[in-house]
Amino acid sequence: KAEIGMYYQQDVIQAVANQGTKIKSIGAIVQSPLSIVLSLKDKNITSPSDLVGKTVGYGGTALSESIVKTMMEYVGADASDVNLIDVGFDLMSSMTTGNVDATIGCLVNHEVPQLEEEGFDVNYFMANGYGIPNYYEEVFLANNEMIESEPEVLKGFLRASAKGFEDFKKDPDGCLAILMNNQNEENFPLTQSVEEKSCETLLPLMETEDAPFLTQTEECWQENIDWMLESGLIDQKVEVSDVMVDLGE
């Protein structure tokens, strides 16, 4: 139904390993995580050690549970030291109303500027500094059949995406104007100042000195496969070649 999709790196690994889905990543959109552990500033939570005895809201996923477990063990604590509560999609409101002390799963480029816009002071930290391997927040993917039969079409898409990213770097305000002019205002209204901050946060994470936009490495995929297998998130080990492909220039 679609030639190209956007998905999360760990979800790609799970889909291939646990369900046998015939897909592969063809390029990384963001070179590092955007998902964070977020809290209001007065909670004084700046690392996993500060989560001991605290209540943390999450979206009910096994991935978030494994991340918390790994982080807590990394700092010498235990997952049972944290009270995890499934709050569904109410990550922000559960925190601002005081129902939880922190949340895991909010995005640094969305919920942080949104909360700051609403007048809240916040603290946050990334999980990948605490036993979690670095990962790509989102990737472009295609099904294996198309990768085999129409690689030139996919290469053309990646070239166009890279051109769009270059335009974004050169004229972020102009690109933001396109976003604002095409927003779904009725169902998902956007705030100009929030989206400006979001772009400022996102832009430097989409490429690094060593990794241009769309770069993905076998090492990053292998580290995530190994961690997910160790954490019980996947039923069997998969090869890097099962989940990613380098289409070349």
Model-based region annotation:
Residues 1-88, 92-97, 101-109, 125, ...:
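Short, glycine-/small- and polar/acidic-enriched structural segments
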Residues 224-249:
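Hinge/cleft segment of the Venus flytrap/periplasmic-binding protein
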Residues 10, 90-93, 98-187:
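Pocket-lining segment of extracytoplasmic ligand-binding domains
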Residues 13, 69, 113, 222-225:
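Predominant activation on well-ordered alpha-helical scaffold segments within soluble catalytic domains
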Residues 148-233:
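Secondary-structure end/capping motifs
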Residues 74-79, 118-120, 186-187, 233:
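Short helix-capping segments at alpha-helix termini
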